[in-house]
């Protein structure tokens, strides 16, 4: 049965941190748009950890879905060069806390303190690409790769973090996802269609920054960003221009004067040829001609570290069935509870659940709300089917419900199915 641990409330940068007494010595180490990160000591394991508080995860359905996606990804992606989830818990105030290993610093801070020697540039790039090979093999795009999302410890072990923006490899995507300096041109040009190659572009920008100690494309805004990219790469080729979906973007690009590319050997005169060659293969306008993470690992520049027997791929593709579902907050909430339960059941953390009376009340309330949403959605579906003279199965699979955008009632199917699943999962807490 679940263990009961005492929750302790404290203030960090004016933000309430409510964590179990298992974790002590809180110190702030980072702040993002969606959460505050503190270092702490795990008294049970006797080691330092990082604790990320997700701000108001259930305030909107969008934030609830984002938190659910990040949790699912952290559970699924297990690799030496990715941050590892060690524990997760829900506080009485309904805040979500992710506990991971503590890395000490990030690449952004490191680049601000000193220039990197060649062997460190090679080793860090190798680890980034090794992690990306695994991520991409799981059918996942990181979408927000940048120096501050690359964590490094005193042994120079590197881990990619912050998968909150990660998405499925899907032909239809949203545009504004990554920090501007590291944003691939296809995101700016099409805003809709892109794939894993966007991470390779970001890694190439980071590679250049490690070499030179400053960002390669420090755009002041969207237009300036595209302009300085073309200063180096020249005008985008016609086959890339033909993929632009936005009429306004197409008009803007075609109105620009033609620019010839600058040879990379000329732009990076003091850099060794192998490094320049790999960089040039990563920073290509046409994403389909950009080198893959797997191919980059076998490039001569990374020969000192390349080991084909120790560069694994994912055992299974990540399940994105939930990603197109437009569900109520209460349904996302109970689905989140089920993921927390599953994490501890399969041996995450210490294999036990931290729970209390307030938590039990949260589960009960959310279960009732999710059940109501499921019942209402199923009733609406049946009413619509009767009025249209159709008699289809209202318990359409979640996969079909979330991906069949052509059906007018597909989201009601999704709510009904996920709501019923949420009730089933939540009942497990009460056993």
UniProtKB/Swiss-Prot annotation:
SMART domains: S_TKc (SM00220). The modification Phosphothreonine is found at residue 174. Keywords: Activator, ATP-binding, Cytoplasm, Kinase, Nucleotide-binding, Nucleus, Phosphoprotein, Serine/threonine-protein kinase, Transcription, Transcription regulation, Transferase. It is an enzyme of class 2 (transferase). Its main location: cytoplasm. The active site is at 144 (proton acceptor). One of its GO terms (molecular function) is MAP kinase activity. Pfam families: Pkinase. SUPFAM superfamilies: Protein kinase-like (PK-like). Residues 374-406 have a biased composition (Low complexity). GO terms for biological process: stress-activated MAPK cascade. CDD domains: STKc_Sty1_Hog1 (cd07856). Residues 23-302 form the Protein kinase domain. ATP binds at residues 29-37, 52. Its cofactor is Mg(2+). The modification Phosphotyrosine is found at residue 176. A motif (TXY) lies at residues 174-176. GO terms for cellular component: cytoplasm; nucleus. Residues 374-415 are annotated as: Disordered. It is found in: Cytoplasm; Nucleus. Activated by tyrosine and threonine phosphorylation. Signal peptide: none annotated. Dually phosphorylated on Thr-174 and Tyr-176, which activates the enzyme. The TXY motif contains the threonine and tyrosine residues whose phosphorylation activates the MAP kinases. Belongs to the protein kinase superfamily. Ser/Thr protein kinase family. MAP kinase subfamily. HOG1 sub-subfamily. This is Mitogen-activated protein kinase HOG1. The gene is HOG1.
